[in-house]
A protein has these predicted regions:
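PLD/PLD-like phosphodiesterase catalytic module centered on the HKD motif
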Residues: 1-42, 46-51, 55, 59-252
Length: 252
């Protein structure tokens, strides 16, 4: 982990934050209910995580950097889309689809494609495995913790994050985020790109993404010297399909 993955840790000596962490640990250890209250400084799941992160995104005015393993929560995806549509420059760092768990593959790819469709830039790290969870807004505030942007993390697990505004800490995070983006590749979310990324997966992975030929057999991923039977996905394809379906329905 120390040499092969991108991870983060924040040290705090703020009395309320330290007290919250201790109280949360003791409650969990003794299997008791933990309620930090509306004035909680820490970001807790499954208590206030989704609301706090959604609000953080909503407050971003110019630039938002997001590093996370999973992009699957509908509320957070909507907030990221809204941010892009109001002119915020959004940079998303994600893990390649082939690293996702098999039962999370469709959700994970679907979430990334939603972001891609509104023009959000999505990259993958070179040389490091992305494990850290970090949001950086306007180079002035950040959220660092263990929360994946997925319903399971927000609703079913004990996850913890901290919001930081200390200039020195934020600057270190900014430099790291800048370095990671500079040393990253655009993530190809086209049908051909996904099939190429999944080529090392077991048989059936491509069919689960509905990228096969429709024969019920697994399609061979597109390699450098192979021709894919699937056309490259284009933006706006979903709208064309919807209009075609509507015309058919009207005729019938």
């Amino acid at each position: 982990t120390l040499t092969e993955t991108r991870d983060y840790a924040v040290v705090t000596d703020h009395p309320q934050e330290v007290r919250e962490i201790l109280e949360g640990f003791e409650a969990d250890w003794h299997r008791q209910t933990f309620a930090p209250g509306n004035d909680a400084r820490m970001i807790w799941c499954p208590i206030n995580g989704r609301d706090r992160i959604a609000r953080f995104i909503d407050e971003s005015k110019h630039k938002l950097v997001v590093q996370n393993e999973r992009y699957q929560d509908a509320v957070i995806l909507e907030r990221l889309v809204r941010a892009a549509e109001r002119g915020v420059k959004v940079h998303v760092l994600a893990r390649p689809p082939h690293t996702l768990k098999k039962d999370k593959l469709v959700e994970g790819v679907g979430g990334l494609r939603i972001l891609d469709d509104v023009g959000i830039k999505i990259h993958k790290l070179k040389g490091l495995k992305l494990h850290g969870k970090m949001l950086l807004s306007d180079d002035t505030a950040a959220i660092v913790g263990s929360i994946n942007l997925a319903p399971g993390s927000f609703d079913s697990r004990r996850e913890l994050a901290i919001e930081v505004r200390d200039p020195d800490v934020v600057e270190r995070l900014r430099k790291t985020a800048h370095h990671d983006w500079k040393h990253s590749h655009p993530l190809d979310l086209s049908d051909q790109g996904l099939m190429a990324d999944l080529e090392d997966r077991q048989a059936g992975a491509v069919d689960r993404l509905a990228l096969g030929t429709g024969s019920g057999k697994t399609s061979k991923p597109a390699g450098k010297n192979s021709k894919s039977p699937v056309k490259k996905r284009s933006k706006g394809a979903g709208k064309k399909r919807s209009k075609t379906a509507a015309r058919r329905k009207k005729k019938s």
